[in-house]
Design a protein with these regions (language model features):
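Post-HExxH zinc-binding segment in Zn-dependent metallohydrolases
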Residues: 145-208, 298, 302-316, 328-339
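Auxiliary, metal-adjacent structural segments of Zn-dependent hydrolase domains
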Residues: 3, 7-9, 13, 21-23, ...
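N-terminal accessory alpha/beta regions
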Residues: 83, 87-114, 165-223
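Short pre-active-site segment immediately N-terminal to the catalytic Zn-binding motif
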Residues: 118-134, 289-293
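Fold-level signature of zinc-dependent metallopeptidase catalytic domains
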Residues: 32-40, 122-125, 154-163, 244-248, ...
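Active-site His/Glu-centered metal-binding helix of metallohydrolases
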Residues: 135-144, 300
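Non-catalytic terminal regions of proteins
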Residues: 118, 125, 129, 145, ...
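Long, internal scaffold/assembly segments composed of regular secondary structure
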Residues: 246-345, 349-350, 354
Length: 523
């Protein structure tokens, strides 16, 4: 648990009146290196006041102060305050701790959880300046994004996630006691290997409470087992029409959510195993929006911590020393290393997101002729409503495709290359000029499209009347083959399915160009 040294703060009382007048005529807040609980509450109240003035809509905030070791523990358990046990979390903890102790990596200043109330963890090693930065960044930046963005509204339920994780931990622990740690661990291994293929991309998720989840689980166990028995029962001989009807492909349409299909239709899974598959699937679904909004989420949080703290400084509430430390940290976060630098690892999502939201504000307040040509509806509009509209209604791919401006492409010196396997050299196909703006923007948007980064694998067919084998089909994107670990992943699929699994890789014409098979290991 990561609750030692908790500082649960009461909701900040409403502060009436207009925003504080401009000008540094107010007494600045004390800014010692060491923080106190009272100072955290004071800074939090000031930041909350300014956030309300800007119209940020957030969940209630709960702050908890934790040690570096507890922060490492939070890393290992994907940032959740409660989780089921699995060896991979311990492995991640040991690796992170080792790198941290050797000075090979630093730790995040905070971890924030998309829940209601929104829980933010502050490291006790932080200075008071860094604690204030974390509060502005996490509690009002990320928090408002979690509450407002359409993907989070569609796919996550902040009110019930903690309850569901408590239920998941208790259920997995109960399964370990009844069926053995090794059996549960092997099942979780296979489910974790398929998490990225275990999400719904188009259907609306359900929002049951903890009590409803318990009742539904018992109903599911009885119903699903009956359905599976009906599906796999030995069928009597029938007429030719009946045989033809039953030999149609199952499922009738390809199924993208592999864990969902296994949960509902795997022939040999016991009810408790189906429930564990469901738990992993629900956790994967919870994190699905975050994988599509990293640039927007981090950019939004960085824009608002910068705006909120600068507003407090302009009001005279922050000292020069505070701002120097804050700006040093902020600059490091939004630093974009150039191509060719030893530390370059691609486009920094913090840098790109912060630059885009800042540029949107500039387009609204001080548009150039070029801005008016590219963004006629945005130029001269109210920047707050424009930024909130962008935050609420886009994900990384569409956000970049819609709002990346020529000016920002020039400032970041963006260009697009093509890496053709048939050619010996890379080709620069577009740069930041009149001829290349749209191609660069489209290329960067595609780079943040999940369908471009993750393989498209769907359930294609089940031999219901034959050997019960499962056939998966991979549709190649830009003729890219699957990675070398495909056989290992297939072993996990066959373990869950219980029978032979085949994977076909097809090209853009539907022709099978590669095929793999895996059989479940004998018990």
């Amino acid at each position: 648990m990561m609750h030692a040294g908790d500082v649960p703060l009461e909701p900040v009382p409403e502060v009436g009146g207009d925003p504080a007048p401009a000008g540094r005529d107010r007494q600045p807040l004390p800014c010692p290196s060491d923080w106190t609980f009272e100072l955290i509450e004071t800074y939090h109240a000031e930041i909350a006041r300014v956030a309300r003035d800007f119209g940020l809509d957030t969940y209630p905030v709960q702050l908890e102060v934790i040690t570096a070791e507890q922060m490492i523990d939070a890393y290992a358990s994907v940032g959740m305050p409660v989780n089921y046990r699995h060896w991979s979390f311990g492995k991640q903890f040991i690796a992170t701790e080792k790198h941290y102790r050797r000075g090979q990596m630093g730790l995040a200043y905070e971890i924030v959880i998309n829940s209601d109330p929104c829980i933010a963890y502050l490291m006790e090693e932080n200075t008071m300046t860094m604690q204030a930065l974390v509060i502005a960044h996490a509690c009002y930046g990320h928090n408002s994004f979690f509450k407002g963005n359409y993907l989070f509204r569609m796919w996550t339920d902040a009110e019930s996630i903690i309850d569901y994780l408590v239920y998941a931990r208790n259920y997995v622990t109960e399964c370990e006691e009844l069926h053995g740690i090794e059996a549960v661990e092997a099942l979780l291994d296979s489910c974790h290997a398929l998490m990225s293929q275990g999400v719904d991309r188009y259907r609306r998720s359900q929002k049951p409470s903890l009590a409803e989840e318990e009742v539904r689980r018992k109903d599911r166990e009885a119903y699903l087992q009956q359905q599976v028995n009906d599906l796999w029962r030995t069928l009597p001989k029938g007429s030719d029409k009946q045989v033809e009807k039953s030999s149609r492909r199952f499922p009738p349409e390809p199924e993208e959510n592999l864990l969902y299909f296994i949960e509902k239709h795997a022939p040999l899974l016991e009810p408790w195993q189906r429930e564990v598959v469901r738990i992993v699937r629900k956790v994967a679904q919870y994190f699905y929006p975050q994988r599509q909004t990293q640039v927007m989420n981090e950019g939004w949080a960085t824009f608002w911590h910068y705006t909120l703290l600068n507003t407090l400084y302009d009001e005279g509430r922050l000292t020069d020393g505070f701002m120097i430390e804050f700006l040093r940290s902020h600059t490091n976060v939004v630093c974009q290393l150039p191509v060719g630098h030893p530390g370059y690892s691609g486009v920094n999502p913090y840098a790109l997101g912060f630059a885009m939201f800042s540029d949107l504000k500039r387009i609204c307040e001080n548009p150039t002729l070029e801005d008016r040509q590219w963004f006629p509806d945005l130029a001269g509009s109210d920047w707050r409503s424009t930024l909130h509209h962008a935050m609420r209604n886009y994900r990384d791919e569409s956000f970049i495709g819609q709002f990346l401006s020529p000016r920002l492409m020039r400032e970041m010196r963006l260009f697009s290359i093509v890496d053709d396997a048939a050619e010996l050299e890379l080709e620069v196909v577009a740069i930041h000029d009149e001829a290349g703006y749209r191609r660069v923007r489209e290329a960067l948007a595609r780079q943040h499209d999940l369908s471009e980064r993750e393989p498209n694998i769907q359930v294609w067919n089940v031999a219901v009347r034959g050997d019960r084998s499962l056939t998966l089909r991979h549709s190649r994107q830009h003729d890219r083959p699957l990675s070398d670990d495909v056989r290992e992943v297939l072993k996990h699929v066959s373990r869950l399915w219980g029978f032979k699994v085949q994977l076909e890789s097809v090209d853009s014409h539907g022709k099978v160009v590669q095929r793999w098979e895996a059989e479940p290991a004998p018990h």
